[in-house]
C-alpha cells in the first residue's frame, strides 16, 4: 500500500483530535481508580491505538499516529501520562505542586526561578513507584532487543506535555529533550528529569500567560531510538514569512537538528513549489559547527566542520524533493500545515535514510488568512493553491 493510499483511509481531523486529548487527559488524571487504564504505563508507537493517544502527550501522539500510517518514524515508546500521574499520587506531590505554582508571581523573575527550582527538586528527589519503574525498564529492554543492541541502545528521551503541539498553542521547546541516553538507569533518571521540566520557570510563565490551567497539563515522555543524523532540519508546509500554502520551506544543516532548532547555526534554506516540487530558491550558508554523537563517552558533542564541507549544501536537489514529498504526505495526514523535524540517518542507505522526528501544527499563519504576492502569482497558481488548500479556501 502506498503512502497516499494509507493517508486517504480515514485521515484524522487534527483539531478535533487535540480537543479530545485535553478532555481525556483531565478525566484520566482525576479518576485514577480506573486501574485497567492506569496499567498502561508505557506504550510502543506501533501498539498505541487512537483511544490511547490521550496518554501520550502531543509529541508522543503525533509519533504514534505517523507510525500507524507507516511513515518513517524511528522505533520507540512513550512513558504515559498515567505513569506520571501514578508518580505524583504515590509521592503525594500533586497538591503541593499545585499550591506552590498557584502562589508564583511570574512578574517577579527571581521568585519565579526560586519556586521553579524548588518544585523540580521535589520531583527529582522522589523515587518512581516500583511498578512504574519496572515497566519502563522492561520497555527499554524490548526496544534494545528490537534494534539488536541488548542493553546498549542510545535513545532520545523527550518531553511530551499534554498542552504541547496544539493548533492554538506554540508550546514547542518549553520542556527538555535529552540525547544519546544509554542504559536502563539513565533512562529512568532522564524520564524523571523530563517530568521535572514541566515546571521550569519558562514553562510555568508560558502557561500562566497563555491561561492554560495547571491541572490540565500532564507529562508523557518519548523514549526513541537515536538517529545518527548526517543532515537534519525543519520543514514547514507553508512559507512562514507570508503564510503562502503553495510553498514548502526547508532549513537544514549538518549533523543533529539541535543546531538548527537552537539557532546555533544559520542553516541552508530552500524554498520549494509544493505542486511541482521545483526549488525556487536555495540559500546556502557557511555552517561552522555540527552536533554529532560521541559513541565512546555516550554523549552528543559540538564540533567544528571542515571549511570545504561547511560551505557545501547539506542536501542534494533530490533530497530536498524527498523531504518535500514526505512533508506533503504528513500535511495531508493531519489536514493542516505542519512544522516538521526530520533527519537523514547516516547509518542507513541513501534513499532509505529519511526519518521523521516530530510533526506539529504550524501555529502562526493557520490562525490567519494566508497572504500571497499578487504581482508574482499567476491565475493558474491561484487555482492550484485553492485546489490544494480547501481549508484555506473556506476561510
Q: Language-model segments: which ranges?
A:
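Short beta->alpha transition motifs characteristic of CBS
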Residues: 252, 357-364
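Intrinsic disorder/low-complexity segments
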Residues: 16-20, 24-28
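Short, Lys/Arg-enriched N-terminal segments with co-localized hydrophobic residues
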Residues: 13, 27-38
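Conserved catalytic alpha/beta cores of large enzymes that bind or transform nucleotide phosphates
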Residues: 247, 251-339, 344-345, 379-395
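A short, polar/charged loop-to-alpha-helix boundary motif
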Residues: 257-264, 363-374
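Extreme N-terminal basic, low-complexity initiation segments
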Residues: 2-8
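NTP-handling and nucleic-acid-processing catalytic cores
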Residues: 174-276
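N-terminal beta-alpha lobe that positions the nucleotide/phosphoryl donor
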Residues: 38-220, 311-318, 325-326, 331-335, ...
